[in-house]
């Protein structure tokens, strides 16, 4: 982090631009689940077809996040963001014209996934972390994460309105154009991204292979990486399948949209609180508590009779916990290894998250088509929440940055 980044006048424009970009990126992505039912019906598909494409999207997002993190070190944040924006917009427009499972897998899956990777938390949060003073990193990461949730709250209900007015096809085309609009917010971020690849004076360069091998030798990092799989499992399943699940319970599609929107609204507060708290409290115990609370919320939702109150109550509870994992998780990566390698090493952790996302989305669609309900995926989500809590508990919060330049690392 540069010494010139200490004044609020220097970092606030960066933070505001980053937040607006994340609002669009995360908000648009969160709206794709609304198209599961109408697009499937229009093309004569079962829900498993588009669910597979959206599962591939999450997998592509995760794999591309690692690649994008490496590209940031080499080419800088600006070029990665612009490349991601182009892919995001083209993929969304391509999804609108997809009439086969294969084309949906390519557009809604591979291309949009790569676009999200280039415009989402793994690229933008490290730029925020570099822009603000160290003592404000937790707060700033919480603000950035909350902005993504604000996008979910605002854009998902708006997307449902667009579907009602324009039909699913017109709404999806409009979302593609909005994706291109993210380019407006890239310029202020350039100042804190383009020198990411430069090694500090007197420090030897390290290859991505060496960086990966040495980071994976740190036990606490591996526990964090494995535990984040569960976060992706929860978030992606609910984002994609909750609207259809609500309709199956006998409610209107608008209730499904407001369920996702309520998650986004409550997560604005949850993510902000998490960011503030992660600067004051042990991050690993916060993560354990979050995953236990998710498991309890899921089980309570299954046990309560279906009603508007139970749907919105679950959405509010899960929303408060939704992206509250990101400030402590990204903060731990920065604490372990510093901010220079954060885009790549957070990208590896996020790849685990997206493997969980792929599992949750695909398995949800598969179980629905084979059993006719979502009970199995809900129960597995509760069980995995408890497992994640156990995985995070033994994490040791300390710096392992020296291990990246050591001949060997074993912690």
What are the roles of these predicted feature ranges?
Residues 255, 263-267, 280-332:
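C-terminal transmembrane helical hairpin of 12-TM major facilitator-type secondary transporters
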Residues 32-36, 218-272:
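Extracytoplasmic gate region of multi-pass secondary transporters
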Residues 64-77, 271-282, 369:
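Helix-to-loop junctions at the C-terminal end of transmembrane segments
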Residues 39, 118-132, 324-337:
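Intracellular juxtamembrane helix-capping segments at the cytosolic ends
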Residues 144-194:
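Helix-loop-helix hairpin linking two adjacent transmembrane segments in secondary transporters
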Residues 63-102:
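Conserved MFS/SLC helix-loop-helix module at the cytosolic interface between two early adjacent transmembrane helices
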Residues 23, 91, 103-119, 229, ...:
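Hydrophobic core of transmembrane alpha-helices in multi-pass small-molecule transporters
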Residues 108-146:
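Cytoplasmic helix-loop-helix junction between adjacent transmembrane helices
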């Amino acid at each position: 982090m540069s010494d010139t980044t200490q004044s609020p006048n220097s970092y606030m424009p960066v933070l505001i631009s980053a937040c607006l970009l994340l609002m669009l990126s995360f908000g648009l992505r969160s709206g794709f689940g609304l198209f599961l039912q109408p697009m499937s019906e229009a093309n004569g598909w079962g829900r498993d077809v588009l669910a597979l494409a959206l599962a591939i999207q999450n997998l592509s997002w995760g794999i591309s996040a690692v690649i994008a993190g490496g590209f940031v070190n080499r080419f800088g944040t600006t070029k990665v963001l612009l490349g991601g924006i182009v892919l995001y917009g083209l993929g969304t427009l391509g999804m609108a014209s997809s009439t086969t499972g294969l084309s949906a897998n390519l557009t809604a899956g591979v291309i949009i996934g790569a676009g999200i990777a280039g415009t989402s938390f793994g690229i933008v949060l490290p730029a925020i972390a570099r822009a603000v003073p160290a003592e404000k990193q937790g707060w700033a990461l919480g603000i950035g994460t909350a902005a993504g949730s604000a996008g979910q709250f605002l854009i998902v209900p708006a997307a449902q309105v667009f579907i009602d007015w324009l039909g699913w096809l017109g709404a999806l085309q409009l979302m593609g154009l909005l994706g291109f609009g993210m380019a407006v917010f890239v310029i202020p971020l350039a100042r804190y991204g383009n020198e990411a690849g430069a090694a500090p004076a007197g420090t030897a360069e390290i290859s991505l292979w060496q960086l990966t091998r040495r980071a994976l030798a740190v036990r606490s990092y591996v526990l964090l990486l494995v535990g984040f799989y569960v976060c992706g499992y929860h978030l992606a399943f609910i984002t994609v399948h909750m609207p259809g699940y609500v309709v199956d319970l006998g409610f209107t599609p608008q209730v499904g949209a407001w369920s996702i929107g309520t998650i986004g609204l409550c997560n604005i507060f949850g993510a902000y609180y998490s960011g503030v708290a992660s600067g004051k409290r042990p991050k690993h115990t916060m993560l354990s508590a979050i995953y236990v609370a998710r498991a309890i919320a899921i089980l309570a939702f299954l046990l309560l009779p279906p009603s508007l109150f139970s749907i919105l109550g679950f959405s509010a509870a899960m929303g408060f916990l939704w992206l509250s994992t990101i400030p402590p998780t990204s903060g731990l990566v920065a604490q372990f290894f510093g901010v220079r390698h954060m885009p790549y090493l957070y990208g590896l952790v996020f790849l685990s998250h997206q493997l969980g996302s792929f599992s949750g989305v695909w398995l949800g669609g598969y179980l629905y088509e084979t059993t006719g309900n979502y009970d199995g995926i809900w129960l597995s989500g509760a069980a995995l929440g408890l497992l994640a809590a156990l995985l995070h508990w033994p994490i040791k919060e300390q710096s392992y940055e020296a291990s990246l330049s050591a001949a060997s690392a074993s912690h």
